[in-house]
């Protein structure tokens, strides 16, 4: 309006808006922050210790490139034992990849609620279909804070070990070789590799000890 030669004050704008029944929808920074905190609540807050299996699951996706192709690896760990309870390898980083991995974990573990599922803010985990899936199972969704990888450091550590101990050490001849190597490493990780957080027990041994103790009680 100023460019067209009109002069108008803030008060005049307010009066015109009142007369027309209009209201401002501007949100201040605190409102936006509070809304984000409610939408992406972090229930873990870097507390990575639990008292039983199926209390908290953590998940993430990484990718590995060979033969000019990206392969995406989605993994879910049980925070109690650090056991890999489900994983899938896909050629596309998609919501379907994370959905099918979660469904595999749920069918295998048949967890007793409450269960918290923690991830970063990747778009697949934020998607409406994925959030509805978790809600349909009664699972509480927890998110890392934006750009804070330490909020999901258990998964960061797992993928670092996977790449350092297996993927970066081998030149795969085919997709089949690569997938077999991932399968083999997961078995090794769960059944043979001691974990410091488990008192140097393997993830499987940590869970078996828990189950045996519960059977005695």
State each model region's role.
Residues 26-29, 117-121, 135-154, 171-174:
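RNase H-like polynucleotidyl transferase catalytic core
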Residues 128, 135-139, 161-217:
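C-terminal domain-tail junction helix/linker
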